[in-house]
Amino acid sequence: ERNEIVLNEKNISGCIKMYLDEENLLDRFFILPTIPEMTNIKDFERAIKQINVDYEIQLVRKKDLLKVQSEANRNTPLAISSMVKIIVAACIYKEISEGNIELSSTIKIKAEDISVLSAGIGKQNIGDLFTIEELLKLLLFVSDNTAMDIFIDYLGEDKIEKFLNFEKSKVENKGYKFNFPLTKNIYTEAWCTESNSEQQWRNSAMKKVVWTEGLDYFIDLDYVRYSMNYLLNNSWIPWDDIQNNNVIYKGGSAPGVLSCIWSTRNLEKEDFLQFLFVINKRAPFSLLEELYIFGCANKLLDFYGVLKVR
């Protein structure tokens, strides 16, 4: 048996479909936002405008680049959260190309390396050896903050800035300074200053908006796109080791921040496509809003034949 609850949240709507078992108990349920038609980047922008947000959206299709952005952030970059890890990964690949390190090079985990809110490496790994290849997988697949800090500490802000300046000739200069603090520093200040349990930290990190206080990574999407292209030019990237890797995805999220990139693999192909966006809101996104945004993105990608929405 199926029951349905209608959802209405300001300018977006949807429903909860609940399926009951033979004993009339809840078996499963789905939250389904109402998704408008998606045939181009303007449709996606129009849909995003239904939520009170700042945004930047980019689409590369048939070697043409389309950009749209909200008026409020014309001259300032938005917070991109963990999507910054694509840039850090590209910097590591540049180090590899210059012969300074190898994918097989190892790093021993020290106590001071361990970040907060980490998704992979923890205190149990102190003293363990990780290869650069393993750290790249942790960085890009599970968005591991400790892997990020190890790479930032190895590179130093100078090498990251040098890499970004290398790309700056292709990017409009908005006159801001690159800033890449350790995740341990920025996220401790954001959510972990009180001596509470990690469970309380993680709860705070799901609810408390801090990008408005400058506690995030702020950078133009152009740098993310160029960094992804730099990754694609390498003979091996972490996505090579997983199935169904014809489309690469990396996202980032924090309260009030959503950022994503989808990219096909071959830069030289006529049908090469990249779709990326960053959306900033001064309050946490509701679950319906997040599902709505991703539903709109998936529908647009499905229209272009990149993803199949079931």
Task: Go through each PLM region and give its residues.
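Short, glycine/proline-biased beta-turn/loop segments that scaffold the active-site neighborhood
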Residues: E98-N125
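Structured C-terminal helix/loop/strand segments within mature extracytoplasmic catalytic/sensor domains
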Residues: P33-D54, K67, D158, K208-R310
